[in-house]
Amino acid sequence: MTAGAAPRLIGRDREIQALTDLLGKGTQAGQALVVIGDPGIGKSALLGAAQDTARAVGFRVLSAVGVESEAQLPFAGLHQILRPVLRSASELAPVYATALRSAFGLAQGPTPELFQIALAAVDLLVAVAAKQPVAVLVDDVQWLDQQSQEVLTFIARRTRPYAIVVIGAVRTGHPGAFLAAGLPELIVHGVDESAADEILRTKAGVLKPADRLRIRREAQGNPLAQAAGSPNFQRSPVMACSSQRSIR
């Protein structure tokens, strides 16, 4: 895998390289990573870059985004992750296939024990990874329902023998099972002054030195705040929506 496989994000060469290296190792042995940072710092953009790189080098990408309104729905997050490969559940032992279908309301009967569902999820990913490396990319893990967080953590701690990569982004200050699992971490800090100026030039064009200094000081290296502080960001609804969606 070449370092150039990932698109460039301003001021994020170190983080992109770390993700690229992780995916490179993941084609041979499982890897897991927690991406941690403040709102607007760029976690979602980094996951997007990881997704592009993973697909470019042959991974099957399974992605999900935690949604606060679904945090009380058991296994909603896990369903997001596994839905594209649920047909492969037919390759599992019947007890595991039934466990997953029951968890997702696709089969009658009581919901199985969480441990059984977690084992079934691992076996399903292993079956898929036997044909093609798998990258599980989850944004806003802190908003996943508790059951899905625990299963995701279970998966991440059992990837080593298989071509499975698990990367989850967590907002700073939101403890949970995934963050507490002791997995390797990538802490995303604010961008430096040079990158901050480049972001401003990209979003706002030419600014007066005093305006540039003010925005840079107020943003404190946060890319979303940096972009939001530019006049062009506020004047362009398309720019505003796009930036808020892609940079967290």
Regions found by a protein language model. Give the residues of each.
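Key residue(s) within conserved catalytic/signature motifs
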Residues: 1-248
